[in-house]
Amino acid sequence: MTRSVYVTGIDRGDGRQVVELGVMELLTRQVDRVGVFRPLVHDGPDRLFELLRARYRLAQDPATVYGMDYHEASALQAEQGTDELMSTLVDRFHLVARDYDVVLVLGTDFADTQFPDELALNARLANEFGAAVIPVVGGRGQTAESVRAETRNAYRAYEGLGCDVLAMVVNRVAREDREELAARLDSLLAVPCYVLPDEPALSAPTVAQITHALGGKVLLGDDSGLARDALDFVFGGAMLPNFLNALTPGCLVVTPGDRADLVVGALAAHSAGTPPIAGVLLTLDERPSDEVLTLAARLAPGTPVVSVAGTSFPTAAELFSLEGKLNAATPRKAETALGLFERYVDTGDLLKRVSAPSSDRLTPMMFEHKLLEQARSDKRRVVLPEGTETRVLHAAEVLLRRGVCDLTLLGPVDQIRKKAADLGIDLGGSQLIDPVTSQLRDSFAEKYAQLRAHKGVSVELAYDVVADVNYFGTLMVQEGLADGMVSGSVHSTAATIRPAFEIIKTKPDTKIVSSVFFMCLADKVLVYGDCAVNPDPNAEQLCDIAVQSAATARQFGVEPRIAMLSYSTGTSGSGADVDKVREATELVRLRRDDLKIEGPIQYDAAVEPSVAATKLPGSDVAGQASVLIFPDLNTGNNTYKAVQRSAGAIAVGPVMQGLRKPVNDLSRGALVQDIVNTVAITAIQAQSPHEKATAQ
């Protein structure tokens, strides 16, 4: 039977979309096929479903998502009664349920007066669907005692109507009340109650939303700038010195278009990072001169300047009526919402309570979710030497918002801050270090000179070397100030990896450093090694690569079944190349008799059960290999790229293995998600019994 989860509420303004998004994230980690159903819907686009469809790559036909609109439902109820309405909605729900393992049901929004008792309506729908219920209570603007009473009453109401209440969620609670309220509710209710604090970034409208609502014209700014949250509104009418003192981080400056001094002053303050602003909104439909706009564009590239026709007072009223929304056009809000949900909800316990069927398949999305979850479970510090690179900054924002790991970014601190401000990126909670001016430079120079004394490196030379961001980052890892390092988006592989070879070096039981790719196919993840480092490993080195790759696979939840690849299977071939693979296979068996391994074996026999049944019947590995070891770099690199292109696989990596501490190299074409994944992998590699890094 399909399991379903019904997220509902008791009134408007509860910020329930945070919970709906969080539950969807949770379900897609565990289950491949997740459907969505909204029993009643208003006319117009469903922005939350569009977000879910884009973020989770849902193939579900949008026409099946909705039961019916409110007007249709009201008419049906009036003409044929409530039972007929329920029967129709249940039939439409089951059209979705039959095709999915789990269905997330999005309850009504309490915005329609045609159904005066929407709580009872949601409760009955949940019961008819056989769905477990997660009621959400809004706490904004209420005392802790009021929220406690409302939550208790909501629980009793849904339970009294026969619902299977999975957990309660209280959202938008004042931060100072959250901890005490959570403790009191935990002792009051028979089910878990998760209390989420109010998060200003979620309720703040974006500059794009404001522009659309007010019918504004964009004079300056790019898409990234328009996506910034307007966390505050500062109205400019004072003289410049007083106006500058009033600026707050993330504020939208609202001023008449003829106040060129305030426009330039606000953007100059943004450029200096004191403080970074969301943008400038010009009233009275007055456009500054071209000279002022040119100066503004140079002061703060990408920062939006928008013109509207209204005067300041009507504009202010409209601004204060706007509230931020989660939708496909606000990915930053989605990351913030998920970070909030994952920080305050025991997702492991909630998933157990859902009792969602575990899938035998492991899709690319499920693998990526598991990476973030595993990294978050034991947070580590990762240093990113390329702190001024745009993609790295965007990835850092995602990692920080989701609470995946702690971050240190290297580079000129003023440049990092300015670049982040220009991109509208919040790096709060990260550590910024300039290797050139850092107090660590002297001690790092001495350390590096000691390590490279046999190469004749003096302290003076070392002082210059450690100013390089990759050497500095590697020394942070070596000295326990970071747990791992990720670089390479603008540096060569050699520039990224060479410092690790010189400083961190290999594990005691490892002869070489190698790499693997996680190849995320449609329904499983395979581990390919080595496709990036060793050109032509000998039998002993190939054995080392196989053992390392098996350990890496297991660390990331892939049960290792090793296929030592060659152009022939079993004893059918001969020659130096196949003999090398045969010898390496035997060495693995001698070294680790607990590992399942087969070799030499051809690729098709390794992964296709039908071929394996003919060529190697009875093998524990053939037809179901999960770790594929290539005989040389030429074969491995070409194969992973061929599979990536022809099979549409997502390649995550390369993941370096064999170093005493994790350092990973990015492709110079890496996308933001690639960087996020690689940082998460690095953090997971650092999760060991050793002490965590200590930030300086």
UniProtKB/Swiss-Prot annotation:
- From its record, what is one biological process in GO terms? acetyl-CoA biosynthetic process
Chief place of localization:
cytoplasm
Does the keyword Cytoplasm feature in the UniProt annotation? yes
What reaction is this protein's catalytic activity?
A: acetyl-CoA + phosphate = acetyl phosphate + CoA
List the Pfam families hit by this protein, alphabetically: AAA_26, DRTGG, PTA_PTB
Which Gene3D superfamilies did the record assign?
3.40.50.10950, HprK N-terminal domain-like, Isocitrate/Isopropylmalate dehydrogenase-like, P-loop containing nucleotide triphosphate hydrolases
The record's note on its domains: The N-terminal region seems to be important for proper quaternary structure. The C-terminal region contains the substrate-binding site.
Determine if Ribonucleoprotein is one of this entry's keywords: no
Q: Name one GO cellular component term.
A: cytoplasm
Describe its function. Involved in acetate metabolism.
Q: Which domain of life is it from?
A: Bacteria
Output this protein's name: Phosphate acetyltransferase
| Root EC class | transferase
Q: Which UniProt keywords apply?
A: Acyltransferase, Cytoplasm, Transferase
Q: Which InterPro entries would you find in this protein's record?
A: DRTGG (IPR010766), P-Actrans_bac (IPR016475), P-loop_NTPase (IPR027417), P_AcTrfase (IPR004614), P_AcTrfase_dom1 (IPR042113), P_AcTrfase_dom2 (IPR042112), Phos_Acetyltrans/Butyryltrans (IPR050500), PTA_PTB (IPR002505)
